[in-house]
Swiss-Prot record:
Protein family (similarity comment): Belongs to the TrpC family.
Entry coiled-coil feature ranges: none
Main EC class the enzyme belongs to: lyase
Keyword Amino-acid biosynthesis: yes
Keywords: Amino-acid biosynthesis, Aromatic amino acid biosynthesis, Decarboxylase, Lyase, Tryptophan biosynthesis
Pathway(s) of this molecule: Amino-acid biosynthesis; L-tryptophan biosynthesis; L-tryptophan from chorismate: step 4/5
Gene it is expressed from: trpC
Lineage: Bacteria, Pseudomonadati, Pseudomonadota, Gammaproteobacteria, Lysobacterales
Record-linked HAMAP family: IGPS_B
Keyword Lyase tagged: yes
Protein name as it appears in the record: Indole-3-glycerol phosphate synthase
Domain of life: Bacteria
Stored PROSITE patterns: IGPS
Species, as recorded: Xanthomonas oryzae pv. oryzae (strain PXO99A)
Amino acid sequence: MSDILNTILARKADEVAERSARVPLAELIARSADLPLTRGFAAAMQASIAAGDPAVIAEVKKASPSKGVIRPDFHPADIAVSYEFGGATCLSVLTDVDFFQGSDAYLRQARDACTLPVLRKDFTVDPYQVYEARVLGADCILLIVSALEDAQLADLSGLAMQLGLDVLVEVHDVDELERAVQVPVPLIGINNRNLRTFEVTLQTTLDMRAAVPRDRVLVTESGIVTQADVQLMRSNDVNAFLVGETFMRAAEPGESLRQLFFAHD
């Protein structure tokens, strides 16, 4: 596990304690019991792929620990509308405050502005956060295998599905993938960024894709920058993508998405 991830996870444990002191778990559980149905994140991804289209999870991200502020002019609702118009299948919204300058409010703003299913992009380590995601309005949560023990992975994914949430399980290497496929969730993300060096190589996805069961949706994450990158993935039967920084640095994120995935010569 990388030093930055260790730092983030230590902070998350404190954050959960702080939040549960303000809003007790029992209250969150009660509030989660009578909510509208989620929008169907995994189903939307599967439908795009079945139609022969790339399934794009477009990320709403202001900053990152490695890059600092990526998008100073940051308006989540406008970005969400732009992404939907540009052809995104789903959204990913960063809610981590301390390391990514995210916010729960950003998720609500983005989701309220469009009809797309939304992933809460955060470091989920405790059942409290799963209930919290459901109450916030998320349709899917992220579980990072390198941050969790097998029992946590099983418990958190099981709770999420019980609450009607989809789960994207993220891996970085073959050992993590072997653990991930034991969890009965339809979405497996392969992060092309090495957590120790922060280097990005698309070869990570290509090397691991054959080990992903055919009944799962393989989502390639990080490093998709050019149409050639997209074509490389699609020619290797990788049809689901999570892209953030490339779009966030563009004046019009949705137009950047359209050009990258849907503009053909």
